[in-house]
């Protein structure tokens, strides 16, 4: 399944006395001169992903007693597929607060899904009210459980690979194709789903065009199309018959 967005805690704070440029400069050179809100804010306005990662790491180190900074570090590790590190970091985040936090529960639910522990994931998602990505996570969980109609409901009007996949698995090929069409930044998985939609619609040109994009973005994923039954008749049609 396409990756879920992890739950970072971001703040839109009104910082007095410092411009955005000054905050960025200090976050790079002297992060300990910024307060926790300023340093967390720096990560949201960083010009590059590398800078954002640096600011998140600095905040978690300097303000380790603030569960928000530690949760953000864990979310960053989880996004980088560092599952063991993320698990340990979320434990530290939970230990840094006296109250259960929805964001930590949500991220731990993602860890549980990755570990195929759907029961634990469902329990934790039930304690994640208020997290913006909750519907998306519930949708993915229901896809893994085979509850495709419920997954469609969970995603609502979401425009994502996961939402398109739920529609596709529910037999709503046209709706799945429409969702993919409206994704602004398509990746290899987007085009793969689009290719399946085209195959189910009998659109050979669409299959070819979308799989070409898959190959351009992810050659390993493109290879899997060779054994995917969704495309069998289209691949076979390219083989010259024997006379």
Question: What positions do the PLM features span?
Answer:
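N-terminal targeting segments with Sec-dependent signals, encompassing both cleavable signal peptides
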Residues: 1-194, 198, 203-209, 216-219, ...
């Amino acid at each position: 399944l396409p990756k879920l967005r992890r739950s970072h805690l971001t703040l839109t704070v009104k910082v007095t006395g410092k411009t955005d440029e000054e905050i960025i400069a200090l976050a790079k050179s002297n992060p300990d001169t910024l307060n926790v809100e300023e340093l967390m804010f720096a990560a949201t306005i960083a010009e590059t992903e590398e800078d954002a990662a640096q600011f998140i790491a600095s905040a978690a180190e300097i303000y380790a007693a603030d569960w928000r900074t530690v949760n953000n570090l864990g979310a960053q590790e989880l996004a980088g597929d560092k599952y063991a590190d993320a698990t340990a970091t979320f434990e530290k985040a939970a230990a840094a607060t006296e109250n259960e936090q929805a964001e930590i529960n949500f991220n731990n639910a993602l860890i549980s899904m990755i570990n195929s522990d759907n029961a634990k994931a469902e329990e934790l998602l039930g304690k994640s009210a208020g997290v913006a990505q909750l519907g998306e996570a519930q949708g993915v969980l229901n896809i893994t459980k085979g509850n495709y109609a419920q997954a469609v409901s969970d995603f609502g009007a979401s425009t994502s690979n996961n939402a398109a996949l739920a529609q596709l698995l529910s037999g709503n090929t046209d709706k799945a194709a429409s969702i993919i069409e409206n994704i602004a930044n398509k990746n290899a998985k987007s085009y793969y789903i689009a290719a399946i939609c085209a195959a189910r619609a009998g659109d050979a040109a669409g299959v070819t065009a979308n799989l070409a994009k898959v190959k351009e973005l992810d050659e390993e994923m493109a290879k899997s199309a060779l054994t995917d039954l969704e495309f069998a008749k289209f691949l076979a049609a390219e083989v010259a018959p024997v006379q």
